[in-house]
């Protein structure tokens, strides 16, 4: 995208001849560019609320968010699932949605798909003069917290394949977490973010002094992280949004499945969802399965995310074993207690959904909380919402 940069010459190169040994040593034979964007930089991710970034800042944030893992800091290890030999092919009956068109033209919305009555009815990508030049149908998109729901779906398959007894199985057979608040907890308490760890973690952050930056660094394994929780004590079993709970769930599946972990991933995404392109979770480099080297950050194409969501819908509507798992976690959904947390000055989690069900968002604003509508929400405005009985 040369329109975003301008070619420059390194200062030291201006005084060197091409025959000078220092010419190559200083990389003067290479082209150098600097961006011509007006970017507002943030210490971490761009805040999700109360900011009005310009287009250039959004371009940079999208690069950092989605392209940096493949370019500046390439992913070297991953748990990757190959495409299905018979991928699911969608039928389409497209209609125009003026509201969605306007959002794509005016906002940072990158991609929008609507699937109803067995077919895609809206299929849009941001215009080329916005973000369309950075995304194609085979572009792998970063999940952020949508990876939490992917982990839950894998857990359902691990249970249905007999590796884990049920959602109430206790984590009392995993030596890695002994002498921590997580030992002997029910799997479902971790899935529902009710581990009693509110004094220690929130979202991706440690609340107590720590030498670690956060709980979702792809270069750190569970053995490293769990050392921060030695001799920790369980607190109240209330909703506490934490990436670490999900990291534990994924790595407990890894522990229970052992050499068959990749088979469970294939069962979930290749056989069930019939993905067209590969999908993957991060894998911690220089680590091992015994140390807990799976990471919940997930990547898939826009259509493969839809294929996975459709597989969930099919499981529910066909009352499969995994469908029963999805129904069970919905029946045992909890309130996120955002109002109570706000009154006492605590952090609240995405207030447009007031309930939580095993790594799914529930009780969306304007929708009856008894209605089985569950969704996935990831940082940066990612949403996959499934109406299980009306789709």
Model-derived segments and their meaning:
Residues 275-277, 282, 331-390:
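Active-site Gly/Thr loop motif
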Residues 59, 156, 172, 188-191, ...:
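Non-transmembrane alpha-helical segments in soluble domains
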Residues 245-252, 296-318, 382-391:
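Active-site-proximal alpha-helical segments within enzyme catalytic domains
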Residues 1-134, 162-165, 192:
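N-terminal leader/targeting segments and the immediately adjacent pre-domain N-terminus
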Residues 118, 139-166, 190, 249-253, ...:
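Active-site SXXK
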Residues 125, 137-138, 202-286, 292-296:
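Catalytic-site signature segments of enzymes, centered on catalytic residues
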Residues 101-102, 133-138, 142-143, 147, ...:
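Active-site-proximal loop and beta-strand segments within enzyme catalytic domains
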């Amino acid at each position: 995208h040369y329109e975003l940069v301008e070619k420059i010459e390194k200062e030291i190169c201006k005084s060197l001849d091409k025959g000078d040994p220092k010419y190559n040593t200083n990389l003067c034979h290479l082209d150098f560019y600097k961006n011509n964007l007006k970017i507002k930089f943030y210490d971490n991710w761009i805040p999700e609320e109360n900011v009005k970034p310009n287009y250039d800042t959004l371009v940079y944030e999208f690069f950092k968010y989605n392209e940096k893992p493949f370019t500046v800091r390439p992913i070297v290890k991953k748990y990757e699932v190959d495409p299905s030999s018979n991928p699911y092919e969608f039928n389409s009956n497209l209609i125009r949605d003026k509201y969605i068109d306007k959002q794509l033209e005016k906002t940072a919305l990158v991609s929008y798909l609507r699937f109803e009555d067995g077919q895609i009815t809206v299929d849009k990508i941001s215009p080329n003069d916005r973000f369309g030049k950075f995304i194609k149908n085979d572009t792998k998109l970063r999940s952020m917290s949508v990876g939490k729901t992917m982990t839950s779906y894998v857990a359902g398959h691990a249970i249905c394949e007999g590796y884990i007894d049920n959602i109430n199985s206790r984590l009392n057979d995993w030596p890695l977490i002994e002498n921590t608040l997580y030992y002997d907890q029910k799997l479902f308490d971790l899935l529902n973010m009710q581990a009693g760890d509110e004094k220690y973690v929130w979202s991706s952050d440690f609340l107590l002094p720590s030498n670690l930056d956060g709980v979702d660094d792809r270069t750190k394994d569970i053995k490293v992280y769990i050392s921060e929780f030695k001799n920790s004590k369980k607190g109240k079993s209330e909703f506490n949004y934490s990436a670490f709970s999900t990291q534990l769930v994924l790595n407990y599946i890894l522990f229970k499945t052992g050499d068959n972990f990749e088979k469970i991933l294939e069962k979930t995404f290749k056989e069930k969802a019939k993905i067209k392109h590969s999908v993957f979770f991060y894998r911690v480099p220089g680590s091992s399965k015994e140390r807990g080297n799976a990471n919940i950050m997930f990547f898939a194409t826009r259509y493969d995310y839809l294929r996975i969501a459709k597989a969930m819908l099919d499981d529910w509507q066909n009352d499969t074993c995994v469908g029963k798992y999805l129904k069970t976690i919905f029946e045992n959904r909890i309130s996120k207690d955002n109002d109570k947390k706000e009154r006492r000055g605590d952090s609240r989690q995405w207030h447009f959904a007031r309930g939580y069900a095993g790594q799914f968002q529930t009780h969306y604003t304007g929708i009856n909380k008894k209605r089985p509508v569950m969704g996935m929400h990831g940082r940066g405005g990612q949403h996959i919402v499934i109406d299980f009985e009306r789709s």
